[in-house]
Amino acid sequence: MSKPLRGRHQARKRAVDLLFEAEARGLSPAEVVDVRTGLADTNPEVAPLQPYTAAVARGVGDHAAHIDDLISSHLQGWTLDRLPAVDRAILRVAVWELLYADDVPEPVAVDEAVQLAKELSTDDSPGFVNGVLGQVMLVTPQIRAAARAVRGPRDT
């Protein structure tokens, strides 16, 4: 059972890498996914992206404005552009999971983000990420309910 969970952790970590790369290169997450997929298709030494990695990166790109607005509204004393780029990417992955990944329990999304912050960012980042996501979690049920209402029962 730990194998799939570890696989998801690696997929999230790779999604953070892709989002970081997209921002650094001025590309959309979908463009970076396409480039990486093309490299894997043409070069056997390049590992293909896991489907969950591509889904997360594309999902963050598709909902970037909403995700960034939600993160920004829960930052205290910070602006999104002042955060370290890796923290932005971690928060974006976690918020996408909180809002759009129905198969990921909210505490798992937060715990995974905190773990990624421990692995990839500064000593202060895990606590910061946990605090921001704790605040976001307070409003995600309402956001999900509103999205379901807009989509209607046949689209869920």
Curated annotation (Swiss-Prot):
Record has Transcription as a keyword: yes
Pfam families in the cross-refs: NusB
GO cellular component: cytosol
Listed Gene3D superfamilies: NusB-like (1.10.940.10)
Keywords of the record: RNA-binding, Transcription, Transcription antitermination, Transcription regulation
Domain of life from the UniProt record: Bacteria
UniProt GO molecular function: RNA binding
Transmembrane parts of this sequence: none
Role according to the record: Involved in transcription antitermination. Required for transcription of ribosomal RNA (rRNA) genes. Binds specifically to the boxA antiterminator sequence of the ribosomal RNA (rrn) operons.
Stated family: Belongs to the NusB family.
Protein name: Transcription antitermination protein NusB
Species of origin: Mycolicibacterium paratuberculosis (strain ATCC BAA-968 / K-10)
Gene from which the chain derives: nusB
